């Protein structure tokens, strides 16, 4: 991770959050340091209902640690508890605060 780059936090553990991490690394390279804040250790992808009606489809599990490592991002497994936009900080469920230059919220449940 580039300590001198802009600090970008992506909060969420779903497909959109993962796509944001991958796209930012590809587009910005080492000009950004990336943190993925996710409540779980795995990305779970379920088949769309049109492909597998009544949730009979299979789930696919992908380890977020490996995805993050592949693009030199930091994975923090914790819940997002709060955002202070004025101070540009987030608070995690553990109480830890982290600063950011840019924040992407990709939350499934509110």
Q: Where are the predicted features?
A:
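Structured loop/turn residues at beta-strand edges in well-structured enzyme cores
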Residues: 3, 78, 98
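Core beta-strand elements of the Rossmann-like FAD/NAD(P) dinucleotide-binding domain
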Residues: 93-102
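A conserved short coil-to-beta-strand element within the FAD-binding core of flavoproteins
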Residues: 77-87
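Conserved hydrophobic beta-strands of the Rossmann-like cofactor-binding core
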Residues: 9, 103-104
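Beta1-alpha1 glycine-rich phosphate/pyrophosphate-binding loop at the start
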Residues: 2-74
């Amino acid at each position: 991770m580039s300590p001198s780059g802009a600090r970008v936090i992506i909060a969420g553990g779903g497909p959109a959050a993962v796509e944001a991490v991958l796209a930012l690394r590809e587009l910005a390279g080492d000009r950004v340091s990336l943190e993925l804040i996710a409540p779980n250790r795995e990305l779970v992808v379920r088949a769309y209902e049109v492909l597998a009606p009544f949730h009979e489809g299979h789930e696919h599990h992908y380890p977020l640690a490996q995805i993050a490592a592949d693009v030199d991002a930091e994975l923090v497994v914790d819940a997002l508890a709060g955002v202070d936009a004025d101070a540009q900080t987030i608070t995690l469920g553990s109480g830890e605060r982290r600063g950011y230059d840019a924040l992407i919220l990709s939350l499934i449940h509110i």
